[in-house]
């Protein structure tokens, strides 16, 4: 991986970790800084989310400081200029989910464009 690719992947990882931080999730404005205006998600529940609906979840305290999400096996790859694909496992309150995100570089920085969660066996 080139230095430029490594920096892009690290920027996406940093953004992903911020979105999992309960202190970031508590403030819609901070979450919005990290989500692309065209953001969509297919959750582990099978539900489809957009920016507005996901803000309801993040601001509702779905991740508590007492029980933070545990991330493992995080990896990323640049799939096109300005686009990074991340995958990792997230463990939260006894539930293990295989997660996948697409991040794209915008005029305001790296933003999550798409996210999907699949329950892990």
What are these model-predicted stretches?
Residues 2-33, 38-121:
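A beta-strand edge to alpha-helix "cap/lid" segment located at domain peripheries
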């Amino acid at each position: 991986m080139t230095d430029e690719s490594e920096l892009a992947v690290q920027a996406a990882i940093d953004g992903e970790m911020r979105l999992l931080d309960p202190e970031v999730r508590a403030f819609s404005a901070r979450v919005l800084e990290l989500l692309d205006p065209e953001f969509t998600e297919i959750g582990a529940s099978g539900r489809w989310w957009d920016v507005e609906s996901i803000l309801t979840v993040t601001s509702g305290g779905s991740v508590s400081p007492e029980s933070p999400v545990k991330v493992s096996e995080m990896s990323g790859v640049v799939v096109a200029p300005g686009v990074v694909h991340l995958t990792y496992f997230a463990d939260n309150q006894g539930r293990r989910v295989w997660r996948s995100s697409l991040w794209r570089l915008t005029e305001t920085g790296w933003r999550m464009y798409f996210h999907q969660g699949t329950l892990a066996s």
